[in-house]
Amino acid sequence: MMTIQRIFSKPLLNKIVILTGLVNGFLLWSLSVHAVDSPIKSDEVIIFLPEVGYPLADGKQWNLHVHGWIYEPDWSSDFSIAFRTLFGLEEYRLEEEKYESIAQERRKLFFVDNEGGKRIPIRIGAKIFVLDQSGSNGHFYGNLLVTAPEVEQWQDKATHTIPFTAITRENDNRQFSGKIYLLDAKGVSVISDIDDTIKVSEVHDKKALLANTFSRPFVPVPQMAQFYQQLATQEPGTTFHYVSASPWQLYPALTEFLETYHFPLGSFHLRLFRWKDSSFFSLFQSPQPHKIETIEHLLQWCPQRRFMLVGDSGEQDAEIYAMIARKYPERIVHIFIHEVPRQNGNKLDYREVFKGIPTTQWTVFTDATSLLAK
């Protein structure tokens, strides 16, 4: 019997083998994409919340964090009256009506049907990952162990991020995209509060805070965007992480704020909030546990990186950052505190707050213009 080697020359046979391998590879990729049973229904929406990825100790693998939220919007209900009454915004009714489109946009994610029990598949490059099951609050997570060559292949070098998309059902052409901010083993990370640090919130006045959060256009703290842009260019690989007690429902509005006023983009670390469980009370509790836990995680994930901490005097940022600086003295490059009015009218005794921390390691300012001159 005549063998295949006698029919084809060796060079031609090699080309056939290579071509066959490529075709099979493509078919396997196609099958792997379409074989995934996407649980995302046509009336459900996903928001991916920007997370971080970092190399493990050996440098050969990276841990990529993914965080998303799946829910069904409720476009029919008007919760204006209930929302104003619950949060004491009745006196801002006329102002809210003036900015009705803003108020409606900010409120709508507080009144959605969260979808639990969903395992969302995502595609990074040509690879498929199925994430952990979503909880009753609709939030889902994933820690993906990948190789350094994969990170090199997948990353967008202009933004130093890895983009990805959710896999939807056949005939569902919607695209739900997210990104993972990559933290090199060494470099500087800027951890920033939001309220009264980069955005005027008036935390000391609870009614003004609620109106600034839910009814009024967001206003930047003067010159802070320029200061952050300056920090971003001081050292290559500088990253930004926005750690706030604000609820995740405000993420779309907050990221639009960053883009509008040209703040550097970065990962977000906000608080979970849901009407139906104890997280409802998180809006009225101290931000300290959430902020400390988040900052310590970033420090532990990236043991060779150095950190700048930026906050304000209105909500325990100075005390939290001082505690972190004492615990990790070699890791904290500098602390910046924006001094704002406090509820009791008293100013912090900063020398007491930062006792034991060199004065060269912390700065208190009322006008960010003074920081631009440094």
Regions found by a protein language model. Give the residues of each.
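Bacterial N-terminal signal peptides
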Residues: 17-28
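Short, acidic loop-to-helix structural element flanking the phosphoryl-transfer center
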Residues: 214-238, 248-252
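N-terminal secretory signal peptides that target proteins for export/translocation
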Residues: 1-13
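Short, surface-exposed connector motifs at secondary-structure boundaries
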Residues: 233-241, 300-307
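C-terminal cap/substrate-recognition subdomain and adjoining C-terminal extension
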Residues: 38-39, 246-374
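Intrinsically disordered, serine/threonine/proline
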Residues: 31-179, 370-374
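Short beta-strand edge segments in extracellular beta-sheet folds
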Residues: 179-185
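Asp-based phosphoryl-transfer active-site loop
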Residues: 189-201
